[in-house]
Structure formats: structure tokens, C-alpha cells
């Protein structure tokens, strides 16, 4: 990730106010997931959004994945005991998700896309791990909201190149572009 988040700023990343960036309740309505979904939070950071999904979906299994050992340790200390077997914490590489092919119902990537050196490669790997008709949710800064923000068209182009179709923009945030793609 080109501008990897500095773990010294962990409290900023873990600020509960960030949960207000996205209307998660509406997102879950739109996604219409089955009763016991398998979810991968790619670039999970401190697990703030992982925790929110685990709370809202009590029967889900969630894989919280990150490249940073500091963030993985933070999640292990602060989340693992509370969520037990429902939470799987794992180290990933920037372009590789360490999960089996066709194993995940939903991948979420929140404020990650603009930090990636090779977003198309990661999206191709996300496609690989998604089940047939699985979905990816990408939320990232709208242009002008963050110094590294990408255009919506650029993100959609990356998703198309990874074979996601259809791709739908959903209005869940004033600050973030929110896109759902299907395998």
C-alpha cells in the first residue's frame, strides 16, 4: 500500500466517529446477505468496521485481514477474545488475500483503494476468493475529501478489469464513494 497508514496514528483510525461515514444498516439491507455469511474485511486496520459488521450480523464469520503486524496485534489483543471463533485475524500481502478460492460471500474494502500500489491485482484476487454471486463493497474518499482520493470512474475501471459485473454505486455517505460489485 503506497501510503500505508502509520500505526502511530492508531487512535485516529480507531475513532468510532468513522463509523458515521457509512450507513451500515442501509448497506446491509442492500446487500441482503444470507443468514451466516463469510465476510473478509481487507485492510481491516484496527478492526473498527470488522467489529461493526460482527455486531450487526451475529451469525457471520469475519476475516479481518491487514498487512500491518501492529494492526494485527491490536486486533488480537482487543477483539479476538470478545468475538472468539467468529473473528479470524490474518496477515495478507498487498495483492494477495490468504483465503481459499470461492470461499467468501462479501469482501469489504473501506478507505483502502487509494492506498494501493496495485489495486487491480488485489481486486483480481478478491474476485478469486468470492463465491459465485459474492459481492465486494468498496468505499473510498470522494475527490476533494482526501489528498489521495481517486475518481469514481478510476475505481470502477479497476473493478471492471478484475471482472466484477454488475457494478452499482450506492449512496451511503457524503464523504465516500460507495460501490458494490458482483462476481
Annotate each PLM feature.
Residues 40, 46-96:
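Class I SAM-dependent methyltransferase SAM/SAH-binding core
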Residues 120-132:
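A short glycine-rich, Lys/Arg-flanked "PGG" loop and its adjoining helix->strand segment in the class I
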Residues 95-107:
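A short acidic, Gly/Pro-enriched loop at the edge of an enzyme's catalytic core
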Residues 133-141:
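Conserved beta-strand signature within the Rossmann-like core of class I S-adenosyl-L-methionine
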Residues 148-162, 177:
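Short alpha-helix
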Residues 105-118:
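A short SAM/SAH-binding and catalytic strip from SAM-dependent methyltransferases
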Residues 9-26, 147-148:
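Conserved SAM-binding loop and adjacent beta-strand
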Residues 172-183:
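Core SAM-dependent methyltransferase catalytic element
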Amino acid at each position: 500500500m503506497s501510503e500505508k497508514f502509520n500505526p502511530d496514528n492508531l487512535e485516529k483510525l480507531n475513532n468510532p466517529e468513522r463509523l458515521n461515514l457509512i450507513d451500515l444498516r442501509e448497506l446491509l439491507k442492500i446487500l441482503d446477505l444470507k443468514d451466516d455469511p463469510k465476510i473478509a474485511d481487507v485492510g481491516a486496520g484496527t478492526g473498527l468496521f470488522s467489529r461493526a459488521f460482527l455486531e450487526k450480523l451475529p451469525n457471520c464469520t469475519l476475516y479481518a485481514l491487514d498487512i500491518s503486524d501492529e494492526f494485527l496485534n491490536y486486533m488480537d489483543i482487543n477483539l479476538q477474545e470478545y468475538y472468539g471463533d467468529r473473528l479470524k485475524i490474518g496477515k495478507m500481502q498487498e495483492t494477495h488475500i490468504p483465503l481459499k478460492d470461492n470461499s467468501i460471500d462479501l469482501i469489504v474494502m473501506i478507505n483502502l483503494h487509494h492506498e494501493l500500489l496495485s489495486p487491480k491485482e488485489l481486486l483480481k484476487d478478491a474476485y478469486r476468493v468470492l463465491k459465485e454471486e459474492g459481492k465486494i463493497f468498496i468505499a473510498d474518499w470522494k475527490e476533494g475529501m482526501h489528498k489521495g482520493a481517486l475518481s469514481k470512474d478510476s475505481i470502477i475501471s479497476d473493478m471492471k478489469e478484475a471482472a466484477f459485473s454488475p457494478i452499482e454505486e450506492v449512496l451511503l455517505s457524503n464523504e465516500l464513494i460507495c460501490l458494490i460489485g458482483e462476481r
